[in-house]
């Protein structure tokens, strides 16, 4: 999908107080950013921010970090953020390839991946956010009981993700191939993509992956 560039988006983001501009310097210190020791949940590839902003509004005692690498998309998330007066949500313009540079061991409690880029070509499989390579990264900074929650309408990507989770030695739970007609739909917050795809009749797939640590 080609993203439309919005003139001035980078400059606006660079001056916005809801965006952390030096995330590498916050590694191991995110609780200082929020000013408390509440759990930290992150969304990688948050898009226009509807999902994570809704979560932050519903859960003021949880800290949220939304990560998006495209400036024009992040700008839309900031617009939503500016309508929310809470102090438990920050954004990063950052490429998840280097995510271990910004989070220390046991610093994150939960990771959300929603409608991630499927990178359909086999040679790009390592770029998929549910690949074994990315799972190994997440394992470095998730707490002992932390987990990854993943949603997609792409069946090929979902099948790949199920396989990668198992091959990586992680465990699966709450797996469904049709979220909106399953027991797991209660409390589900939809993303912009999810609203569109489900309205077209596309089933939404969901899994939770966790690693049993000693």
Swiss-Prot record:
E.C. no: 2.1.1.33
Binding residue positions for substrate: 121, 153, 191-194
Reaction it catalyzes: guanosine(46) in tRNA + S-adenosyl-L-methionine = N(7)-methylguanosine(46) in tRNA + S-adenosyl-L-homocysteine
Pathway assigned to this chain's UniProt record: tRNA modification; N(7)-methylguanine-tRNA biosynthesis
Keyword tags: Methyltransferase, S-adenosyl-L-methionine, Transferase, tRNA processing
Highest taxon, organism lineage: Bacteria
tRNA processing is among the record's keywords: yes
Similarity comment: Belongs to the class I-like SAM-binding methyltransferase superfamily. TrmB family.
PANTHER family given in the database record: 3-DEOXY-D-MANNO-OCTULOSONIC-ACID TRANSFERASE/TRNA GUANINE-N 7 - -METHYLTRANSFERASE, PENTACOTRIPEPTIDE-REPEAT REGION OF PRORP DOMAIN-CONTAINING PROTEIN
Function in brief: Catalyzes the formation of N(7)-methylguanine at position 46 (m7G46) in tRNA.
Protein known as: tRNA (guanine-N(7)-)-methyltransferase
Organism: Lachnoclostridium phytofermentans (strain ATCC 700394 / DSM 18823 / ISDg) (Clostridium phytofermentans)
């Amino acid at each position: 999908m080609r993203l439309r560039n919005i003139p001035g988006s980078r400059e606006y983001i660079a001056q916005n107080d809801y965006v952390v501009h030096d995330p590498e310097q916050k590694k191991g210190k995110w609780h200082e950013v929020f000013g408390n020791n509440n759990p930290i949940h992150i969304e990688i590839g948050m898009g226009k921010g509807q999902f994570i902003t809704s979560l932050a509004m519903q859960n003021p005692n949880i800290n949220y970090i939304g990560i998006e690498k495209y400036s024009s998309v992040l700008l839309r998330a900031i617009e939503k953020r500016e309508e929310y007066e809470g102090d438990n949500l920050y954004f990063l313009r950052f490429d998840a390839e280097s995510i271990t540079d910004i989070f220390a061991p046991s610093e994150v409690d939960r990771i959300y991946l929603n409608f991630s880029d499927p990178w359909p070509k086999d040679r790009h499989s390592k770029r998929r956010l549910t690949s074994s390579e990315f799972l190994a990264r997440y394992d470095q900074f998730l707490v002992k009981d932390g987990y990854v929650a993943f949603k997609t309408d792409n069946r090929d990507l979902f099948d790949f993700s199920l396989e990668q989770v198992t091959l990586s030695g992680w465990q699966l739970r709450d797996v469904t191939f049709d979220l909106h007609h399953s027991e797991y739909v209660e409390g589900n917050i939809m993303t912009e993509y999810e609203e569109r795809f489900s309205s077209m009749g596309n089933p939404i797939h969901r899994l939770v992956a966790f690693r049993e640590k000693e």
